[in-house]
From Swiss-Prot:
S-S bonds: none
Name of this chain's protein: Photosystem I reaction center subunit VIII
Membrane topology classification: Single-pass membrane protein
Entry's transmembrane regions: 6-28
Keywords linked to the UniProt accession: Chloroplast, Membrane, Photosynthesis, Photosystem I, Plastid, Thylakoid, Transmembrane, Transmembrane helix
Natural source organism: Acorus gramineus (Dwarf sweet flag)
GO CC annotations on file: chloroplast thylakoid membrane; photosystem I
Database matches in PANTHER family: PHOTOSYSTEM I REACTION CENTER SUBUNIT VIII, PTHR35775
GO BP field: photosynthesis
Pfam families membership: PSI_8
Protein purpose: May help in the organization of the PsaL subunit.
Record family assignment: Belongs to the PsaI family.
InterPro entries to which the protein is assigned, alphabetical: PSI_PsaI (IPR001302), PSI_PsaI_sf (IPR036357)
Location in or out of the cell: Plastid, Chloroplast thylakoid membrane
Length: 36
């Protein structure tokens, strides 16, 4: 295992997954407020 390949794969994955989770949680929060 090389230390150069891990960041090149791990960083973009976190850069895509973290904003997706943040947007999903915010979207669900807005939906709950609209329903109530």
């Amino acid at each position: 295992m090389t230390d150069l390949n891990l960041p090149s794969i791990f960083v973009p994955x976190v850069g895509l997954v973290f904003p997706a989770i943040a947007m999903a949680s915010x979207f669900l929060h807005v939906q709950k407020n609209k329903i109530v």
